[in-house]
């Protein structure tokens, strides 16, 4: 468990991200793809059902022994809360109510945030725009680990710890890499979340709040669904910086596995991403792809060529001009 990862730096490239050019080519060849850029009519109902399910779980958690509370937080709540963060990801692209109603999408994301226990939705949207616009951009894309992470988490045991601590790194990294001023929506997100947490605590006590927070921390940490964090952009094959996953867990994660398709067309809702591949299979079928997030996690931990440094990075124009 002590072998160090083989990489000592990121994979620096001097080309633009590939998705912009792919998008232009595909739209020119398949204009029917534009018809997929419409709101998901079922997203709001699915998310509402998930939020209500977690509220019911909170009520049930009052009578659970602590060991069972943490078991169900991992086995059930972790799946639901992780999936809700992926719903928030989808909503951040205005797929719940359409691009013409950005305010409704923002407030609905805050509603979806409620079972997560901590304010997340507004901050995620603020930084996720840069992830698409400046994929791998040095100092801009906060999805890319820091040098500190790459140098410290370089052995199997440390990489395992890094995976378990993903919620903390995703929270703290933006503050270190690309700090931004707090927005009004972030303040609203925080106030609404605190009010919801206080209400749950007042009604049902401590255990439901512990259940929700444990669901988020465990579900976003060392959990099978968390394989998507690594599968999406970690360089399993040199020259490829985005990968899709075509496995069964897409059914409960809003098709987040269709990640190549998503970066090619961010405005297409998750429910329509499989149709992109169906319309233009020659753009996807030959690319390297994943079929098991558990295997992704296993390979990441035990393959010396993989680690936090196994990411493509580039210097973007905005980064050059920031000073």
Curated annotation (Swiss-Prot):
Subcellular location: Endoplasmic reticulum membrane
The protein's annotated pathway: Membrane lipid metabolism; sphingolipid biosynthesis
Enzyme category, top tier: oxidoreductase
Keywords from the named record: Endoplasmic reticulum, Lipid biosynthesis, Lipid metabolism, Lipoprotein, Membrane, Myristate, Oxidoreductase, Transmembrane, Transmembrane helix
InterPro entries: DES1/DES2 (IPR011388), FA_desaturase_dom (IPR005804), Sphingolipid_d4-desaturase_N (IPR013866)
Recorded topology in the membrane: Multi-pass membrane protein
SMART domains (alphabetical): Lipid_DES
Protein name: Sphingolipid delta(4)-desaturase/C4-monooxygenase DES2
